[in-house]
Structure formats: C-alpha cells, structure tokens
C-alpha cells in the first residue's frame, strides 16, 4: 500500500475511533437514503436465509445432503458428468414396500397392496425429483445470482461510501491543518460514492417485482407437485378400496389342522429348527448383501473399508459406481467393482 493509502486508512480509523469512543457525530445521510439502506439490509438477510431454508425444504436430511455433496465432488474429480440424486423419502419407503410385497407373493392380498402402494410412492419420488430440479433452476439459482451479483455490488458501494465518509469527516474537522484541495477531493469522492450507492439501491428496490415473479414460479412448481401427488394418491386409494371390496366377497376358509410329520425328528423327538442348522457364515436369503473380491482401504471420509471375503450388508446403491452398506456395525460407501453381489438390492 502506498504512503497516501496508509495515510487515508489512518484518517478513517481515527475518525471511526472518535465516533465510537468519544461520541463525535459524523455526516448524516438523508432519511430516504437510510430507509433504502435498511430495506437492502433486510433483503440481504432474507435472501441468505431463504436460500438455506429452500434447500432444507427440498432435501430435509442434512446427513444425505452432506453425503451427496461429497459424492458429487468425487464424481467431478473423476470426470463423471452425471450427478447423484437426493434419495427421496417416498422412494425409500416405496422400495421397502415393493421388496416385501413381492416376497409375500401374488396370492397375498397384503403383498399385492404393498406392491401397489410402493409403485405409487416411487412415482411420487419421481415427481419430487422434478420439483427439486424445477425449484433449483427457477427459484434457488436466481436468488443465488441476486446474492452474488446485485446485493454484493450494492454492499461494495455502501462500504466504499462509509470509508469515504470517514475520510471526509476527518478532514472537515481539521480545516486549516489540511490543504483545501484535499478536503475538496474528499467531498467530491464522498458525493460520488453516495450517488453510486443511492442509484444502485434505488434501481434494485424499484425492480423487486422480479423477486415476486420468482416466488410465483416457486409456488407454481409446488402446486404442480402437490397436484400430481394428489392424482397418484387418488388413483391408489381407488385401487385399495376396490381390493377391500373384492376381498369382502371372497368366502372365508376354515382352519384345517395338518398332521405332524415325525419322519425327520432327531433322537430326542425334536425337529431341528432352521436357525440351528445355520453356521456362522450362512447368509439370510432375504438380506441384500455382497462379498468382497479384494481388500478395500478407505481414502476419504464416509468410505467403508473391508477385506477380501467379508460379507457386507447392502443398504443402497448411490450411483453406477458406488454402493452403500454396513459391516460390523459401521456404514459407508465402497466401489461396486470391488465386490460380488450375493443377494441384490430390490429394484
């Protein structure tokens, strides 16, 4: 910094100290300017908090948000274009219902109903994905641009104005000790900064209908999401009511006890249970899992390490390259090409 620059910084600091500690009064700006400045300050705070809350509205689980951020960063580093999507709660519940509905089979009324509800929830998850994309593009991104460009520029003008105001007030109180030319230049710079800040705030506040338009687009997207979800649920409700009506017309069967087959009992007259036949390496047939083909050492936070031959419980497929699973009470991500799937995840 030049000598002149250091001198100016000293003037500002000295004037600020005088105002804060000694109670000296600085140059007052007009009420209209102060009113605009207050509205800009409130708008800046509103935009910052709305951006945060809008993201929570679309993706309420902070752990999943952090996980997605890490995975998408890793994908970018690997040169992968496709980003990992947020796992919608409707989709997760739908997967669960589909899995057990199919296991119960088509001869089970409850199983068939689980499949129908699961498929409907999967459709709702797709609609929610569309809402996420729509709101991000038409509401969150424009607000982010507003914060990063317009409000940032206004903030720059206001900070510059305050600096020049302090410099001007310092020199104004030292008339006779400071050359008149310096005071005149300080006045000109102060007035120039005030005009720039005033014009930028005025133009922003006069065009705030743009933000109203963005809110309208957000509401329209939310309305469309709820409209489509209502249609899906209404159709599902009709199916379930029809299934209940048909089930009430089917005659109930009487329970008929079956004779016990004693041919396979052991010496004590007790048939071995299925659980007693399992060894420590047996895998439940209904539990999605995989076996490690190679040792995998985690390099990043959130990754799950394992050894060759380890049996890992599968909980989710993140993308075409990564699984999420559990091993010995720990959960994390690991590459698909390091394992052999034994029981696949439900589709």
From Swiss-Prot:
BAR domain boundaries: 18-249
Annotated region described as Interaction with ARC, given as residue ranges: 218-254
Record keywords, A-Z: Coiled coil, Cytoplasm, Endocytosis, Endosome, Lipid-binding, Membrane, SH3 domain
Location of region: Membrane-binding amphipathic helix: 1-21
A molecular-function term among this protein's GO annotations: lipid binding
A biological process from GO: positive regulation of neuron differentiation
Topology of this chain in the membrane: Peripheral membrane protein
Compositionally biased tracts (Polar residues): 260-284
Subunit annotation: Interacts with SGIP1 and DYDC1. Interacts with FASLG. Interacts with ATXN2. Interacts with BIN2. Interacts with ARC, DNM1 and SYNJ1.
Additional facts recorded: Cells overexpressing Sh3gl3 show inhibition of transferrin uptake. Olfactory epithelium-derived cells overexpressing SH3GL3, DRD2 and GRK2 show accelerated differentiation upon addition of apomorphine due to reduced agonist-induced endocytosis of DRD2.
Classification via PANTHER family: ENDOPHILIN-A3, SH3 DOMAIN-CONTAINING
Comment text on domains: An N-terminal amphipathic helix, the BAR domain and a second amphipathic helix inserted into helix 1 of the BAR domain (N-BAR domain) induce membrane curvature and bind curved membranes.
UniProt-recorded name of the protein: Endophilin-A3
Organism: Rattus norvegicus (Rat)
